[in-house]
């Protein structure tokens, strides 16, 4: 049985509230779970101490049992110091698009030509 530590949504429409639970990976998002490990209330301020509540001892127990945290839960565990989240590095994503790169190359070429023309005019 593949176990996941994941979020189960609660609350009402436009007012989300999530429970951090251990569940079988095949069960529905809000379906049956084995144990509640904590909660996350995204409606609270980011610096509020009750925004994320975790039972660290039980989280560590389930990780030792082989439960895999989802991406969002892994962020919470990393903030709490319970698990290490690998750094994601995608330098290609930060590059400008093809057209923007072409425009930048053209602007650089025009600037070089203008600088060369200015130096020739100053030399005469």
Curated annotation (Swiss-Prot):
Stretches with biased composition (Low complexity): 114-124
GO BP of this protein? translation
Q: Does the keyword Ribonucleoprotein apply?
A: yes
Which keywords annotate this record?
Ribonucleoprotein, Ribosomal protein
Identify the stretch(es) annotated as Disordered. Answer: 85-124
Comp. bias (Basic and acidic residues): 99-113
State the name under which the record lists this protein: Small ribosomal subunit protein bS16
């Amino acid at each position: 049985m593949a176990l996941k530590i994941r979020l189960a949504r609660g609350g009402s429409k436009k007012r989300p509230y999530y429970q951090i639970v251990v569940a079988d990976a095949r069960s529905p998002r809000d379906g049956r779970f084995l144990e509640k490990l904590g909660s996350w209330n995204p409606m609270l301020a980011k610096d509020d101490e009750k925004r994320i509540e975790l039972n660290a001892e039980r989280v560590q127990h389930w990780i030792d049992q082989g439960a895999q945290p989802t991406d969002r839960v892994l962020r919470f565990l990393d903030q709490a110091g319970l698990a290490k989240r690998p750094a994601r590095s995608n330098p290609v994503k930060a590059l400008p698009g093809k057209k923007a790169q072409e425009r930048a190359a053209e602007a650089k070429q025009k600037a070089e030509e203008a600088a060369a023309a200015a130096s020739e005019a100053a030399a005469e």
